[in-house]
């Protein structure tokens, strides 16, 4: 389902899609990077909804996701996915990263999302190698889309380097 995947160089907060995925931390308290940008652009409504979720279930475990409204963003929802911190590659990081994408897509299907934008989860402050993360993300998303009603998945990459790495991984997807 590679044809449903688009790569975009830009800022994820500017995307006009049904759902934007946030690279969240397990405490669900806004941080830096993508998380900080989404909270800033979306306004306090997102943090308020996350506070209710925290009160109900604590945080969100690594490899899982929760959904909120999108506040002031041009989306209906924000899906807060918790990717793994890179610890050298021998601590189930690959499976946890794949799970963060899959759980986000399952929530998207549950909420009838047709268009969704992902950042490169775990590759910023969490230190996951971008080449490895791009291959995992694109493979998992492509496989998931086979049985999904989601029409378009955008990977929105902020840096030139991330865009180039994802482009290369995208070209290799069917090989």
Curated annotation (Swiss-Prot):
Range of residues in the leader sequence: none
Residue span, Macro domain: 1-174
Pfam families the UniProt entry points to: Macro
SUPFAM superfamilies membership: Macro domain-like
PANTHER family: GANGLIOSIDE INDUCED DIFFERENTIATION ASSOCIATED PROTEIN 2-RELATED (PTHR11106), MACRO DOMAIN-CONTAINING PROTEIN (PTHR11106:SF27)
Family: Belongs to the MacroD-type family.
Protein name: Macro domain-containing protein TTE0995
